[in-house]
Amino acid sequence: MKWVTFISLFFLFSSAYSRGLVRREAYKSEIAHRYNDLGEEHFRGLVLVAFSQYLQQCPFEDHVKLAKEVTEFAKACAAEESGANCDKSLHTLFGDKLCTVASLRDKYGDMADCCEKQEPDRNECFLAHKDDNPGFPPLVAPEPDALCAAFQDNEQLFLGKYLYEIARRHPYFYAPELLYYAQQYKGVFAECCQAADKAACLGPKIEALREKVLLSSAKERFKCASLQKFGDRAFKAWSVARLSQRFPKADFAEISKVVTDLTKVHKECCHGDLLECADDRADLAKYMCENQDSISTKLKECCDKPVLEKSQCLAEVERDELPGDLPSLAADFVEDKEVCKNYQEAKDVFLGTFLYEYARRHPEYSVSLLLRLAKEYEATLEKCCATDDPPTCYAKVLDEFKPLVDEPQNLVKTNCELFEKLGEYGFQNALLVRYTKKAPQVSTPTLVEVSRKLGKVGTKCCKKPESERMSCAEDFLSVVLNRLCVLHEKTPVSERVTKCCSESLVNRRPCFSGLEVDETYVPKEFNAETFTFHADLCTLPEAEKQVKKQTALVELLKHKPKATDEQLKTVMGDFGAFVEKCCAAENKEGCFSEEGPKLVAAAQAALV
């Protein structure tokens, strides 16, 4: 391999990109430039999302007013770039506008202190106050007729409310993708409000969209956490692996260019710079479509779409076919006598190339596994290149990957077998027991939320072909475990969880999988109130009923952490029978009052 050519290409792209950035920042008015690039509709939507993500407690009407004022100001600057304040940075303009909110101190407490800081510290301060768990009640949709009337009465306001409600609940949602989902939402109502049975049309379509939106939010939160906690290098490595799997015909220089651009886009969105993020994402889509011949044969269909659909299509595009003439990996990375020289001259480029070559050959591997293999390869070279005979030292490095590959394969196999046996709800309960014993200090709502999401991996991945299972499962687990890490970081209670979350991004899942029962945990005192139920349980939707039962299961385990699976099975079986009996009774509340204490006493006796 011609490393001089390779490295020259790498730096050529880096410098060309940097020059592009300098040109970008030379505009007289940044806000006018973004307004012109994005157009009024997308600009206003992004401003509404930005304010909703920063000021999560403010009413919708306040945000509409703020977004309107900023959009009008941008429009004026677009007409006359030398107008008053048009030359201010976007952070300054947005921060100044946030600090005009009269209720800032009352609603957000010490967040108001951010306004005493100067940029960029003020923006960093606002970012630090974003709340991943704002505690808003679940959204309850009105009747279909009322929804359709609201949609038809004022479509712009209706879609604005959608953006607001999602953004305030998900303060790191990928903003340009949220605009895309709002467009999908609009399409659902445009279709279903004409249907004879509006409810039958809306129900499944809204639920399918809701699932996509929740997954999109979790994925972007994972990306933002990767950037915030582990830096650009970790995010770029993740992106190289993912894009190399998806675009195996593209060369490493092309993948590197796209990864560099993609990293910038996500850094901007994670940093609250939504206008820049959306604009740069559109530019990246344009670049990919202009260069599709050197990236992938699968892009053409995406490139004929309008900008929002185009970017989304490119993000979800199917994997290209593998080139048929790929040489053995060993030739460049084991057998070449210059391995140590090439590694030491440009470590990140050499390791990036290894990751690229390995990933494009293994579309069946999870990104996390590919990164662990690259890390192992790096550690081997660090060790071997310091010896007298490096080639002998690293000769078997590719064979030594086997245990790292076997571990997630066996984990997925075992858990999919358990899922097939228990079904989703039973599988969730098994994970609840597992994770409560690993980290009993974590709050019960968090353990229930995370275990329910982990349990969905079975439904999502176990039905897939063997070649897709591991990639689906482990990458989904990485996203869900990130939710645990984000919530735990806010109120840390377990050193073991902190360790797994903070030591290594790629080893997070193996770290959690490897945790044993926490023997240092002091059991909670028994509280009968926790196990007291009322007739309202009977009318809850099935999912909420499951959460109530799972909450009781976690609390039982926190009281009796050494309870065996058989004991827990008995107690939860009794609990299910108790709920069924009382919900069928004529006097439901009377049944719960009378039978509840008996159940509690029986459970305590069974768990001795």
Swiss-Prot record:
Processing after translation: Phosphorylated by FAM20C in the extracellular medium.
Disulfide bonding pattern of the chain: C77-C86, C99-C115, C114-C125, C148-C193, C192-C201, C224-C270, C269-C277, C289-C303, C302-C313, C340-C385, C384-C393, C416-C462, C461-C472, C485-C501, C500-C511, C538-C583, C582-C591
Pfam families: Serum_albumin
Main localization of the protein described in the UniProt heading: secreted
Signal peptide: 1-18
SMART domains: ALBUMIN (SM00103)
Tissue localization of expression: Plasma.
Residues that coordinate or bind Ca(2+) 1: E30, E268, D273, E276
BP term (GO), one: negative regulation of mitochondrial depolarization
Modified residues (Phosphoserine): S29, S82, S89, S443, S513
Keywords in alphabetical order: Allergen, Calcium, Cleavage on pair of basic residues, Copper, Disulfide bond, Lipid-binding, Metal-binding, Methylation, Phosphoprotein, Repeat, Secreted, Signal, Zinc
Complex and partners: Interacts with FCGRT; this interaction regulates ALB homeostasis. Interacts with TASOR. In plasma, occurs in a covalently-linked complex with chromophore-bound alpha-1-microglobulin; this interaction does not prevent fatty acid binding to ALB.
UniProt similarity note: Belongs to the ALB/AFP/VDB family.
Name the record gives this protein: Albumin
Native source species: Canis lupus familiaris
Lineage of the species this protein comes from: Eukaryota, Metazoa, Chordata, Craniata, Vertebrata
Encoding gene, per UniProt annotation: ALB
